[in-house]
A protein has these predicted regions:
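DPxDG-like acidic metal-binding loop motif
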Residues: 60-91
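Short, well-ordered amphipathic alpha-helical segments that serve as non-catalytic structural scaffolds
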Residues: 36-51, 97
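Short amphipathic
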Residues: 25-29
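Residues at secondary-structure transition points
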Residues: 31-39, 70, 74, 78, ...
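Oxyanion-binding and handling regions
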Residues: 1-23, 35-38, 92-215
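Phosphate/pyrophosphate-binding loops at sites that engage ATP/ADP/AMP, CoA/4′-phosphopantetheine
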Residues: 44-60, 146-151
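Generic structural marker for isolated residues within well-ordered, non-membrane alpha-helices
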Residues: 44, 80, 159
Length: 215
């Protein structure tokens, strides 16, 4: 098994997984909103010390590139790129959708992330894991269509605003992160430059464009 250090900073929670000599070391914080930049490095350092490992011993680094919090995504990417630059080891970019759909072979899955205001980031996969809906910004009506077509709803988040008529499985974030790293790292083509997956413009960008258009 490869040694790796992976982080998911794309949501309110923080997940860091270190795999070293076949053993996993995990830190999971349910509510880390707005503190990822302060928490990530100390957590990574603590796990490395606990395992008696060093960054140079990692075979690769992984980060979640979206969808999710714009700020959180940037923090995770910058950290992984920094580790990669310091060690010369590759980066494995992951998406929140792949994490939500991990171990879902044989099922049709609609992976969801909360986009606020009653909207969701979504990506659908068929029984073989192929995308049937690329990363999109959708509402409850679109979700219902997928449910009626036999799709299972999954998320790494607790979707508190999702209506009760929808049943959404929440996968364990740390397990999804670790299992996705171990499966996807088997294919060298999955490694590369981590590029943020922004499905829609940030609120700040939208406001700037609106102000510019009003001039």
């Amino acid at each position: 098994m490869k040694n790796y250090l992976a982080a998911d900073t794309a949501s309110k929670y923080l997940t860091v997984v270190l795999s070293y000599n076949g053993k996993r070391y995990v830190c999971y914080e349910e509510d880390c909103a707005m503190r990822h930049s302060a928490e990530l490095m100390p957590v990574a350092d603590r796990l490395l010390k606990e395992a008696g490992a060093s960054l140079s011993e990692m075979d690769f680094f992984a980060c979640v590139v979206g969808a999710g919090s714009f700020t959180g995504i940037r923090i995770g990417i910058a950290t992984a790129k920094g580790f990669s630059l310091a060690t010369g080891k590759p980066v494995l970019p992951l998406t929140s959708f792949r994490l939500a759909a991990y171990n879902g072979e044989g099922k049709k899955i609609l992976a969801l992330c909360d986009a606020l205001h009653g909207k969701y980031y979504a990506c659908a996969f068929d029984e073989t894991g192929l995308e049937t809906l690329p990363p999109s910004y959708i509402g409850q009506e679109e979700i219902l269509r997928f449910v009626n077509d036999g799709y299972i709803l999954r998320s790494t988040e607790r979707l508190e605003n999702l209506p009760d008529r929808f049943s959404c499985e929440r996968v364990t974030p740390s397990e999804a992160l670790a299992e996705s790293c171990e499966k996807l790292s088997e294919d060298p083509s999955n490694f590369g430059e981590p590029i943020a997956l922004y499905i829609r413009k940030s609120q700040a960008e939208t406001e700037r464009e609106q102000k510019a258009a009003a001039k």
